[in-house]
Amino acid sequence: MGFFGFGKKEKDKMKTGLEKTRTSFWGSIMNTLTGSVIDDDMYDELEEKLILADVGGDVAVHLVDKLRDRVQEKGLKTGEQAADALRDIIAEEMTPEAEMDLSGKPAVILVIGVNGVGKTTSIAKLADYYTRQGKRVMLAAGDTFRAAASEQLEIWADRAGVPIVKAGEGADPAAVIFDTVKSATARGYDMVIADTAGRLHNKSNLMAELSKISRSVKKAAPEASLETLLVLDAITGQNAISQAREFCKAADATGIILTKLDGTAKGGCVVAVKQRLGLPVRFIGVGEGIDDLLPFTPEGFVEELLPREWKH
């Protein structure tokens, strides 16, 4: 693997998926930086453009303040140097404190999120990604509240070439996931990826349901590790982050999957997620194909968003 952990195929997918974002709002940001002297006008214009790119007002101010400090500390003189500094700052802001914990036997990933954000397809894409990494993956159809959710996931499981455990509509999700983890453990599978309900009536219901699922995982396999990934739709941007805040608190999420990045010209919500939600982005969706979910690397993302070889 080359480019920050990516091979050429992944780098090309990232480049293509972020084209709309790179050539619009973020291209304008590059023009501001590389076409200006470093002064208050440049900082003001940069802040405005970061807000337009859907970074959010508070995060835009934070980034510009950090850039001012970095420019002063390092004695930077040119717009190109300021652009380099901004790249570094954004990558630092998005860097997770730790890698995902997939050390368990099996490693269990719960996937949560409201309906319509691409949760089911993200599960299949995760299964495909980890299968290509040499893992044996089993899916759990834990969204038993929505008609056809299990059938939809079964179709995607077939495409990904992985087995799935499911039950009838209205079955207990914790029981379905318990059975899946038990089966995966008995059959020597490395990983279970579990769907969960996309809509529960209130926060306490959600907390109770996910707490019950967590207990069922540990009961089924005491050696299991557990990650909970929240799926957000990048097209809805800052609205997605606002809606997710309460969801995160209730669900005890450990990371984010950001879908549909290829469908937005803004993309700034990726930069804002970690600071606003306190959670790292783990994967990004850059297309509709089953292999269009990429592991998120801050440096690789920033290099595509704010390319060093920039032509006005």
Regions found by a protein language model. Name each.
Residues 2, 9-13:
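Switch/coupling subdomain of P-loop NTPase systems
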Residues 2-3, 76:
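C-terminal effector/interaction modules appended to NTPase cores
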Residues 3-5, 98, 126, 242-244, ...:
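Short beta-alpha junctions and helix-cap segments that line functional grooves
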Residues 4, 17, 251:
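Surface-exposed, interaction-prone regions with an acidic/low-complexity signature
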Residues 15, 20-144, 149-194:
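Primarily NTPase-proximal linker/entry elements flanking Walker-type ATP/GTP-binding cores
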Residues 152, 172-187, 201-310:
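Conserved catalytic-core segment of NTP-binding enzymes
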Residues 195, 311-312:
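Short hydrophobic/aromatic patches at helix-to-coil boundaries
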Residues 197-199:
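Short glycine-rich anion-binding loops that position phosphate/pyrophosphate groups of nucleotides
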